[in-house]
Amino acid sequence: MKSFSPSTLVWIAVASQLGTAQNCPILGPAYPAVANLAAPKLTAAKARFEKALESINRTSTSFAVQVYSAHDDGLIYSTYNTATERVGAATVGPDTIWRLFSISKAITVYAFLAKLGDGYWNEPITKYIAELADAPVRDPIRDVNWAEVTVGSLAGQSSGLTRDYSLRDRSTVQTQIPGFRELKDSEIVQCEALRMIMKTYPWAPSYRTPNYSTMAFQLLAYAAENITGESFPDIVVNELFKPLNLTRSYVPIPRNETNIVNYPKEAWELDLGDLSPGGGYSASASDLSALGRSILRSTLLPPILTRRWLAPTIHTGTVWHSMGRPWEIMRHRVPATPASNVTRNVDIYAKQGGGGVYTTAIALSPDHDIGISVMTAGDETQAAFNTIREAFLDIWLGAAEEAARDLAEATYAGSYAAKTAGDNSSIVVGLSPGEPALFVSELISNGTDVLAFAVNDAGRGGKGGQFGLWLYPMGLVDEREKGKKRVAFRGWPGVVGVELEEACGSWAESDRLRWGNYPGDSYVFVVEGGKASTVENPGLGRTFWRV
């Protein structure tokens, strides 16, 4: 049998990945997230964000905005504005209460997960709401096939159900609309929830296409009540509000509060009843930020459950938006550096709410461990909200990416070498200008220049430029030893400056080499006192020490 040296085998695997020779980022962060809220790039973003918000009409629109990190209980940034025209709060601040409207859907799912986990997602809803099991399916266009509607599809806007059964039905407020059919008394919408839900038309078969449904979350709450024997408002309070000390959050709208935004009064006092799990909750900006921070931290859920939750479940008709449970996932292109035309895709897990003059949102960037809470109300609320949203995407995500890049350079960049006498092995780690991720520009193993060997043996995929390895963090961190942590990265070979192709497939090209079951593309750094002291490649069987 022909034998190969470890170095040769490493680059046989590398050669197979050189067809495009591009820096094709994997899904996930390019660098470990920044924990320091005073990082210079984050500090500089505040003034830019304030400048972007100058276009908002502050006379007619009240708002509260908080940007926060998973790594600190404080805020990276906050700003508040009290409209001088019809606002309902003397002074808007961090504890002012706003109607959340459809953000309630995310809170409902969070409470369900905290109480019951996600083991029920694939179960049919008919198992937990017996009345639905008795509903006949005579006409597939007229009748919902409830046996195909799962608990998870209700949470993920993929149940195929219509929007709701009464909120937008004009028969609740007027007896006749010119040109519309006359209704029998039995057809007029009343407060018999399940009977009316069973009378609704389907939107589509479940899991075919996403559709916005508020009543889906009413059914999700009914299922939780039938499983646990507890009222759903009690589940929300006991599983979320109390453990997180959310003292300015409410399932029923508070009637005796004065620090509220209640313009118009009718919108504030709207009682959604059993539809509240889909839009009836209220909270302050500070409480909403604490809720978002707890998700990023996995405070109430096991980390594996959080990772399953922060994932798409179905796509929409645009490549830039997908749906989760019930996340409205925006895919945003973040530049590697401010002057670079090289970008990577960052998924933002958001839930927006709105009704009347209110527009609200919670948005999380797991790649950066940051989030934002946005509350707006007033005559120009949508324009204000859009300005804040775009500024968050363009300014705060870019700043978080830059801050993480600076931290990665300070922590990991440098020259490392073997300590063993006579072992000519070394590695140089740094950044490639205008490209995401750490970059290995030199790698010598036992006297062999493995980067030169690889590019000479396999070529550059027809591309010019410097050849090397991009290192991406894998979310695997060992902190068992006090004062030290081991952080795992994986390496992807390529050529600097190659334009990214939409069809790049780094996820399918990784981990191609095993040497005695040791990975050849793994790089494990030991960080002490905020600085990497060593880097190990298990496949090469070498540890390199900072020099």
From Swiss-Prot:
The keyword Hydrolase is assigned to this record: yes
Keyword Hydrolase in annotation: yes
Gene Ontology biological process: antibiotic biosynthetic process
Residues of the active site: 102, 212
Pathway: Antibiotic biosynthesis
Signal peptide segment: 1-21
InterPro entries per record: Beta-lactam-related, Beta-lactam/transpept-like, Beta-lactamase-like_AB/R
E.C. number: 3.5.-.-
Keywords linked to the UniProt accession: Antibiotic biosynthesis, Glycoprotein, Hydrolase, Signal
Annotated glycosylation sites: 57, 211, 226, 245, 256, 341, 424, 446
GO molecular function: hydrolase activity
SUPFAM superfamilies named in the record: beta-lactamase/transpeptidase-like
Function: Beta-lactamase-like protein; part of the gene cluster that mediates the biosynthesis of sordarin and hypoxysordarin, glycoside antibiotics with a unique tetracyclic diterpene aglycone structure. First, the geranylgeranyl diphosphate synthase sdnC constructs GGDP from farnesyl diphosphate and isopentenyl diphosphate. The diterpene cyclase sdnA then catalyzes the cyclization of GGDP to afford cycloaraneosene.
Family indicated by similarity: Belongs to the class-C beta-lactamase family.
Protein name per UniProt: Beta-lactamase-like protein sdnR
Organism: Sordaria araneosa (Pleurage araneosa)
Gene: sdnR
